[in-house]
């Protein structure tokens, strides 16, 4: 199975982090995640996260420093996840692909079930 690069946004505002609940009809449905998506050919990871957040949340973001990377593999996917700190620069969040969302503090992460990979990166925040 080919490894896929995925870029995810750690969107921050007022010491809170934006998380979104995956669509129940998709792989890992019902779990929370830091939104993002697959890297297209000839696209940088920063371009990937900007495009994916615009498509999924209808907002424009500034991509800051990279937080870290994680790997996740199961019977359906093999991904190399790249996480970037981001801030919203324009627009209001509209959920196009996710079922729910929340702005949470570090202490509140434990109240949500995260997708594999994403739950491992939380310790770096």
State each model region's role.
Residues 56-63:
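Short secondary-structure junctions
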Residues 60, 69-92, 100-102:
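Active-site-adjacent beta-strand/loop module that shapes the phosphate/pyrophosphate-binding cleft
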